[in-house]
Amino acid sequence: MAVFLSAGLGVLAPPETCPHPETSTSWESRLGTRFPSGSCTMSTEAQAMAEPTGQGPKNPRVSSVMVQLEMKPLWEEFNQLGTEMIVTKAGRRMFPTFQVKILGMDTLADYALLMDFIPLDDKRYRYAFHSSAWLVAGKADPATPGRVHFHPDSPAKGAQWMRQIVSFDKLKLTNNLMDDNGHIILNSMHRYQPRFHVVFVDPRKDSARYAQENFKSFVFTETQFTAVTAYQNHRITQLKIASNPFAKGFREADPDSWPVTPRPLLSIPARSRSSLSPCLLKGSAEREKDTSKASASSSRTPTQPHNQLLPAPDVLLAPATYRPLPYQNLYPGSPSRAGPPRARLAPYPLPNISTAGDQEDPTLAAGLGLLPTSALCLVSNQASQ
């Protein structure tokens, strides 16, 4: 029946002003009931299982139904801080997600599960940041169109509903009054109470006569919340990030939690050293030995006043920085700056310079790079003659 589909609460809006959900099917015409505004099952902090109270005589197929709220400790933790739910124009899912465990259904009977949201009062609220508290800001805005959200698996046998936890993870909240996607329309900065309904799909043709007997409503006070477009209480934001598995990116983005691994500057990986040629490896080892000898000798040398401004070069750079670069293997013939300095050969042999009293030692000239090796041999032969 259209009245059942259009509004979950008669005080919100007349039935003719509320649009039908997009997922309505032929079986829904048999759900000829209208939810009462005040008679529903209330849960308390000490009562995890909802019990029927004040709903009149019920069909045996719904009278024994009991509902348990999942994640109850998390809901209570949010409720102590003042739960906030984001509403957007496109629609936003609830967190914590409304999940229940159902018991006592007829395993062979068909049931439909749905939710609606009722305002807790006729006030509009604002958040005072200096006192971290919600304050009354005035009278409530005009009521939004009342809608109900059918679980997408409805209708289903009681055995299927009781087999697993029922989750309303597809339910979305919006503040768009022109929404045509079937989302629940709420006013921002208003407080709401979710309600859960179990409806027996009566196969009788005159099921409209028994409409008030074929449903049972449940209310969990710890699930009430304030609709907001952005979180007001920073503690709510922190709790949602910490408990929401889909907020993993926010937790990893915290710079304080990044691991700090010290890495040496200008270091060369070990495997790149193995790719060098044997000649370069040998030259690198010799230079490392020379560097260590130079550092040892410098430690024994007394410090000069003019050398106290800057440390020795081998202290500024680690020995590993003197290794040849990997690209030098690609061009074997190219000169390498990292190698030992080579004496430049003279373009022509120098004459044997002699003085009046003595003759200059040719080995000294060769050692200074003034004479090539061939010239050194020639001068030695002449001296022996």
From Swiss-Prot:
Family matches, as InterPro entries: p53-like_TF_DNA-bd_sf, T-box_DNA-bd, T-box_sf, TF_T-box, TF_T-box_CS
Main location: nucleus
Gene Ontology biological-process entries: positive regulation of DNA-templated transcription
UniProt xrefs under Pfam families: T-box
Keywords in alphabetical order: DNA-binding, Nucleus, Transcription, Transcription regulation
Cellular location(s): Nucleus
One Gene Ontology CC term in the entry: nucleus
DNA-binding residues (ranges): 69-252
Superkingdom as given in the UniProt entry: Eukaryota
Biased composition (Low complexity): 331-347
Polar residues biased stretches: 293-307
Molecular function per GO: DNA-binding transcription factor activity; RNA polymerase II cis-regulatory region sequence-specific DNA binding
Region (Disordered): 283-310, 328-359
CDD domains noted in UniProt: T-box_TBX1_10-like
Keyword check for Ligase: no
Stated role: Probable transcriptional regulator involved in developmental processes.
Matching PANTHER family: T-BOX PROTEIN-RELATED (PTHR11267), T-BOX TRANSCRIPTION FACTOR TBX10 (PTHR11267:SF102)
Protein name from the UniProt record: T-box transcription factor TBX10
Species this chain originates from: Mus musculus
